[in-house]
A protein has these predicted regions:
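Alpha-helix C-terminal capping/helix-to-coil transition sites in glycosyltransferase folds
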Residues: 1-2, 92
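Loop/turn-to-beta-strand initiation segments
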Residues: 2-6, 28
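Conserved NTP phosphate-binding and transfer environment spanning the P-loop NTPase/kinase superfamily
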Residues: 13-165
Length: 165
């Protein structure tokens, strides 16, 4: 009806070709991205890609039972998909939401480190795992005990009050 709302989520949702049958004035596009705004020091910013990979490693282990090596091995394919299906359309959004939390790397550390330490030296993903372990060494770990159940971080670490699959 006239007051119905259709929510389309996913990598193709900003692409107008996917919603060509909906008039432009009836669309409101929200782009959610994790844009890390922290620096390690005055000259070295934290790469957004590293923080996003850590999120994915933790989430894939918890939700899909995927080990860190497998997630790391798929990362370049994920990045190619973003380059083709997300980034060209991100400017088409009506509003952008940065989902990064200032404290998330301190929380993710406790979940990510054991997963990264499980990557063996003889695996091709070892160098990336070693790099991420060193990167996490810049942060003091923190308990997830005080992370609210409605926090977006719960999508990755579990314990959300929302059914996020």
């Amino acid at each position: 009806g006239d007051r119905d709302v259709l929510v389309i989520e996913g990598i193709h949702s900003l692409n107008d070709a996917m919603t060509y049958s909906i008039d432009k004035e009836n669309k409101f596009k929200i782009y959610i991205s994790a844009l890390t705004q922290l620096n390690i020091d005055e000259h070295n910013r934290i790469p957004t890609t590293d923080a996003r990979l850590l999120r994915r490693i933790v989430r894939d282990a918890a939700k899909r039972g995927t080990n860190a090596a497998k997630t790391i091995s798929m990362w370049q394919s994920v990045r190619r998909g973003e380059d083709e299906n997300i980034f060209p359309y991100q400017e088409n959004c009506d509003v952008m939401f940065n989902s990064v939390l200032i404290y998330e790397l301190a929380i993710l550390k406790q979940y990510a480190e054991p997963l990264l330490f499980s990557v063996r030296e003889d695996q091709p993903e070892y160098e990336t795992a070693k790099y991420l372990i060193k990167f996490l060494g810049y942060f003091l770990g923190s308990s997830s005990e005080n992370v609210p159940q409605n926090s977006i971080l719960r999508e990755f670490i579990g314990g959300s009050c929302f059914n996020v699959g």
